[in-house]
């Protein structure tokens, strides 16, 4: 168009976005083989105010960690059982939910604005997108293992 070309490359970034798999940034792939996808929402919890509506909160009183059934079977984790998620900066225990739609090698945890299950605490504060500065909620790295116990 002639409008943007004079400015291309001036900020020191690629002219077009380039996909970089998050596991390339993983400091220890053998120790943290899973991708942690965090910050999603459940339909009943769209805004923080809906967390405080008792009948909505009772629909799902615990934060769930969703993983592929094949991963759960391989790790010995039962649907409704407890699993532990470990990252380089911390660990949390969640109830497991097996979901065929979750890709193998990925664990999906919705955000929880209160309590000791806050998945944001598992992601390093300086793990940011280099271009936008946005936190890397959708693509961090972790280890998943059974924690014992059931719902």
Regions found by a protein language model. Give the residues of each.
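Long, contiguous, secondary-structure-rich segments that constitute the structural scaffold
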Residues: 52-66, 70-151
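Long, low-complexity segments enriched in small/aliphatic residues
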Residues: 1-55
């Amino acid at each position: 168009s002639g409008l943007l070309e004079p400015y291309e490359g001036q900020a020191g970034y690629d002219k077009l976005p380039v996909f970089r798999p998050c596991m390339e940034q993983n400091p220890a792939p053998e120790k943290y083989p899973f991708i942690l996808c965090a910050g999603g929402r459940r339909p009943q919890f769209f805004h923080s105010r809906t967390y405080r509506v008792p009948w909505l909160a009772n629909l799902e009183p615990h934060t769930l960690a969703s993983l592929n059934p094949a991963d759960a079977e391989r790790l010995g984790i039962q649907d409704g059982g407890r699993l532990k998620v470990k990252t380089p900066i911390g660990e949390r225990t969640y109830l497991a939910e097996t979901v065929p739609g979750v890709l193998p090698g990925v664990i999906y945890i919705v955000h929880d604005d209160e309590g000791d299950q806050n998945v944001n605490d598992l992601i390093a504060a300086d793990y940011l997108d280099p271009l936008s500065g946005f936190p890397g909620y959708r693509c961090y790295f972790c280890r998943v293992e059974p924690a014992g116990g059931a719902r």
